[in-house]
Amino acid sequence: MKIAIIQFGGTNCDMDVLHVLKDVVGVDAETVWYKEESLTGFDGVVVPGGFSYGDYLRAGAIAARTPIMDSIKKIASEGKPVLGICNGFQILTEARLLEGALTTNEYPKFRCHWTNLRVETANTPFTSKFRKGEVIKLPIAHMEGKFYAEEATLAELDENEQVVFRYVDEKGRLTDKANPNGSLENIAGIVNSSRNVLGLMPHPERASESILGSDEGRKVFESMADYITENF
């Protein structure tokens, strides 16, 4: 098993993800520069956080049009898992691998703090180690994290159980106060219709060891690794 961690100009969470995959979860992982045109030999992809190309035009817009994206789409089409974290989520929506868009926070400022999330489904390659309804704690760090989609798209995401994480309070309740960016329906993460592409704004790699304040994020990577082992 080998997982690719994609690096763009401005990516800054790649080494954190590499550490978690290799040293915490114990799987083979390797960084891949965006100019590469092939991901042959990789069984999964992580598109990490950062500020690719300075968020010019829109967050993720330039990265979504780089050479590596065709290979990421191919990986996804093969059913292999693709995980986009924060800027990675933005890139995946810009590349149309995921529905919706990430726009400027309702209160246009950078938000960096812990959030409570409710796991809406354990039926994905990334959440099999969670329980549906479980409340976990992960940090956010973004200015353009407000999830937006048309009403029909939101209804489809709900109907197909494609919403994976929602912002909640510590008791698991959906409240406006628990929503850090104004995301519609408190959405923090979604999967595609095939369920093998996940994007989320919170950072699981920053909550994968207890010394960081939470180790619940490691389950995202452990679930991903288990899925690859069982299917590829």
UniProtKB/Swiss-Prot annotation:
GO molecular function, one term: glutaminase activity
GO cellular component: cytoplasm
InterPro entries (UniProt xref): Class_I_gatase-like, PRibForGlyAmidine_synth_PurQ
Reaction catalysed by this enzyme: N(2)-formyl-N(1)-(5-phospho-beta-D-ribosyl)glycinamide + L-glutamine + ATP + H2O = 2-formamido-N(1)-(5-O-phospho-beta-D-ribosyl)acetamidine + L-glutamate + ADP + phosphate + H(+); L-glutamine + H2O = L-glutamate + NH4(+)
Pathway: Purine metabolism; IMP biosynthesis via de novo pathway; 5-amino-1-(5-phospho-D-ribosyl)imidazole from N(2)-formyl-N(1)-(5-phospho-D-ribosyl)glycinamide: step 1/2
Sorted UniProt keywords: ATP-binding, Cytoplasm, Glutamine amidotransferase, Hydrolase, Ligase, Nucleotide-binding, Purine biosynthesis
Cellular location(s): Cytoplasm
GO process annotations (BP): 'de novo' IMP biosynthetic process
Primary residence: cytoplasm
EC number(s) recorded for this UniProt protein: 6.3.5.3, 3.5.1.2
Location of the Glutamine amidotransferase type-1 domain: 2-232
One Pfam family from the record: GATase_5
PROSITE patterns with a match to the protein in the record: GATASE_TYPE_1
Active site: C86, H203, E205
Self-association and partners: Part of the FGAM synthase complex composed of 1 PurL, 1 PurQ and 2 PurS subunits.
Summary of the function given for this chain in its UniProt record: Part of the phosphoribosylformylglycinamidine synthase complex involved in the purines biosynthetic pathway. Catalyzes the ATP-dependent conversion of formylglycinamide ribonucleotide (FGAR) and glutamine to yield formylglycinamidine ribonucleotide (FGAM) and glutamate. The FGAM synthase complex is composed of three subunits. PurQ produces an ammonia molecule by converting glutamine to glutamate. PurL transfers the ammonia molecule to FGAR to form FGAM in an ATP-dependent manner.
HAMAP family: PurQ
Protein name: Phosphoribosylformylglycinamidine synthase subunit PurQ
Gene source species: Methanosarcina mazei (strain ATCC BAA-159 / DSM 3647 / Goe1 / Go1 / JCM 11833 / OCM 88)
